């Protein structure tokens, strides 16, 4: 099959727009129409919804089987069916599975592969053996192949796809010689999740299809439960152990718990093995229980059992069936009661059978068990011939038997081998093998029954009483494909007798050592006698030998009983009295009447025997023909499977080619991508090398740039210093202007007569004369000229940064509240470099004298010093060297500073002289006011303070205050003191 590409009517780009599967909850309806296997055996199918490309994809998947309720599961198992003829089509009852897939299970991203896995399981041997996986098939859910096409534009009420097809169950075993398992026909539908709709399924089977329907092998339309033992967790309870038991006759169920049933009544009860129309009947035989929980006060309960269904529990209806109450309180009751429960046929897939053990005294539930009815296997009577064994009782009284007895009946296909297994103490051949079921029930395989069991299918009777001569009056039904198959040379009916009190032992139902055993060989002669009996009412056998008479029967009859030797049994079997009716034939008259008929009956018997032999021969021939037909059908099915396998191989080859093409395209795209990335990597490496070379070339430039930046920072610091000095000069100019203003003030008119005229703030000469006003004007002009030259020099490329000699300042004004400190605060702020200090200028005179040693009248010259700091440390450099103009300006500036300092010294001396004169004048004035006259040439050395003490306010008024500028000039700065100390050291 060639690949045709995507749908031409719907582009691939619109696929995600039309169908957003990852955003929807989807339903997959998968119905198995028929199935066929290539080999005989018992098979089951397991269906699982998977998405292996997504981790944890099974979470959120819900599964609905037939019309049951949705359950959180992604896998389900059908019931077990038996393939008798290879190639024959079989059907399942659990055949419709609805998988609800959550959002994100199916996606359009190409990373999703949702499919349904169908596995074929083969069950051989006992029910405890693990199932063998012999075949599997994969059904793609989403995305789908081209055929059949999906309806990508479907609405919510429409199906994405719906069709019927076939799946081949391919070989799953590692054995290379194993062939394909078989195939199945299915019907599938895929759509958006819809609300569940109520539907009623037809559970009735047509007579033309006699199939086993569920997973529990029982008889007729009824199922039978045997001994029940409550499971024990922490409340001293045991697990439920049960095995197939005998079929009981329907018992009337009272509304309330009844008393102990009489097992000896109704020796020939009428049994009905057919269920009513459209209903299913479940027959439950409750034998006993052990380890029931006691009451809170430690008292023992009065137990009885209530049997109901889940619908009755939900609707709170009264129970249909319940057992009798024990005669006394006990934790290990024995009931032996049989009850019937009827349900609708369409509800078998949804109903559960609930067994509740109640306490009659406290009306409380002791234990409860739920058994799904869909796990049980149903027999239809029109499909099979059933063998019925009716056990009446013991003919003679027993000795040393104080307790009721139970009987285990089984039909073994080979009694010789069965006896050998019993001698070897094989657990499966001794007693009653029990199957322990844990609740809640996890798998229906616990209810499965093997097709052939060499130990037979044991069935348990009710306890028979009285103990001296027990009577059971109970029937046992055994399945057979036809009447003659259960009668052969080695087949035998085995009856084992056990005490019923064994269930109260430490190990419940430990039936290891029987009290006695009876064996009835089921040979073909016995079968012929059953067919030729009067009115076909069966063969009645009395005085059947019982083994171990020394422990079982009375001593009087023990010697006369035969042994279990088969030869002796064959000899005595001809002497067994056969009764064709319930009445006795001891009357001689009846014997005479029957003699003519016996001759005729013998003729009929011979004819019937011949017919039976002919029938057996024809059956053998029919079996041979069936085998040949089966072989032909298997060959035909093998050919069809091979054709299907070839078609599948072609499809697989096409899909593999498509995947290979896609992989090649991906490889090519990845190869181009790798080449592109390699080119990019080469370009990146080249660019990296260029950047490294550029970085290495820029290293010297970066170092030079850092040096220039350092120089620029130093220049900025020097500029800040110059600005700081300019501010100081401005302050000095303001002081000088104030002095000039004070000198130009008019002389007050109220001065005392004879007092010399003195300008405030103008120093006097040595003889009391005032200095010329032109001196201050000259200083102002000189300062203006110097400021103009500084502005010109600042505009040049290499700024001249000078540091002016700090003026002497009064220490009191350098404090926190000093005037000069406030004025200089902005010049020494955060912007001013902390590393720059003002060094005092060296004041000298011509001839090398210092300021202190200067000759009188010689002007003091102050030489400023320029400090420049670099990264290597502090060094002194004169930036004015090399240019004559700079030297001239520096000389002029130095001269101006020396002039300023000399004038300041003169002002200081004048202020001091004026203060002394003022003090003398004040003293003289006080003397004159007090009448103390002194000669004009007298000199006062010590002036008394009496007048001052008498009138301190007047003295304070007369005492003039020095200008603040004078005081400030007398105070040296801290920087001068610090740098002077450094120079001395």
From Swiss-Prot:
Organism domain of life: Eukaryota
Q: Where is the composition biased (Polar residues)?
A: 946-956, 972-985
UniProt keyword annotations, A-Z = Coiled coil
Region labeled Disordered — which residues?
Answer: 228-263, 821-842, 931-985
Q: Where is the C2 domain?
A: 263-398
Task: Kindly give the PANTHER family that the UniProt entry links to this protein.
Answer: COILED-COIL DOMAIN-CONTAINING PROTEIN 33, SPERIOLIN-BINDING FACTOR
Which chain positions lie within coiled-coil regions?
A: 599-745, 885-928
Q: What is this protein called?
A: Coiled-coil domain-containing protein 33
Single biological process term from Gene Ontology: spermatogenesis
Q: One GO term of the cellular component aspect?
A: peroxisome
